[in-house]
Amino acid sequence: NKLNFSLIGDPALTLAYPDYQIQVDEFAGVNVAEETNTYPQVKAGSKITVKGRILTPEGALAEDFTGTVHPTVLDSKEEVTTLDNRGEGAYTYTERSKTLFSGSDSVRQGRFEFTFPVPLDINYSDEEGLLSLYALDAVHSNEAGGAFDRFLVGGTDDDVSLADTLGPKITIYLNTPDFSSGGQTNTTPLFVAELEDADGINTVGNGIGHDLSLSIDG
């Protein structure tokens, strides 16, 4: 029945957007604090440094904001087509389905800086990517949010190095870090795998062998 619908929540409620804003000042060595026609290039194999600040609701530098910033870098948009399981016709739409980087870094006196590696299997589209940012000052219970999309994803860095032949360091345990191999567990143990790599871990999933997977007794 096309007249049936479900109402979840109150449409009159204000969305819980952070009061503080995040502004990106520098991206890949380019001053982007002001609107310009210069779009930095995010190339495969490069390392990009981002600098920014936290702004109060009034637009001033939040010098008392100290905490953690969580950046997420998404690839350019790409077309995705549904499987047409119902035989009613496939639907094509665009979305950012690939995450190039997800991490965290510190915020001190309202300012932050972080560097992220760009994987080789990007879209190479020379179209806009997206940097989504969230920051938290747990001491003062302040949150900040922001986004930046004035950069292009494509090309390969001239100084790209393929010398990384070492896999990530993997620490595996059940329930607690004190667990020793062959030890006893309860009937429903929690499996934990901690991965660490100085060059980053590629989870884009755009190539063979780049998906994280777990095989038990396989």
What are these regions (language model features)?
Residues 139-169:
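Short beta-strand elements
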Residues 1-56:
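Caspase-like cysteine protease fold
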Residues 117, 134-138, 196:
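Beta-strand-rich extracellular modules
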Residues 72-87, 214-218:
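Short aromatic-acidic-glycine turn motif
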Residues 93-117, 123:
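Aromatic sugar-binding surface patches on proteins
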Residues 120-130:
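Short glycine/proline/serine/threonine-rich loop/turn segments at secondary-structure transition edges
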Residues 28-35, 171-179:
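Short, solvent-exposed loop/edge segments of extracellular or virion-exposed proteins
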Residues 35-71, 178-214:
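Contiguous beta-strand segments within globular domains
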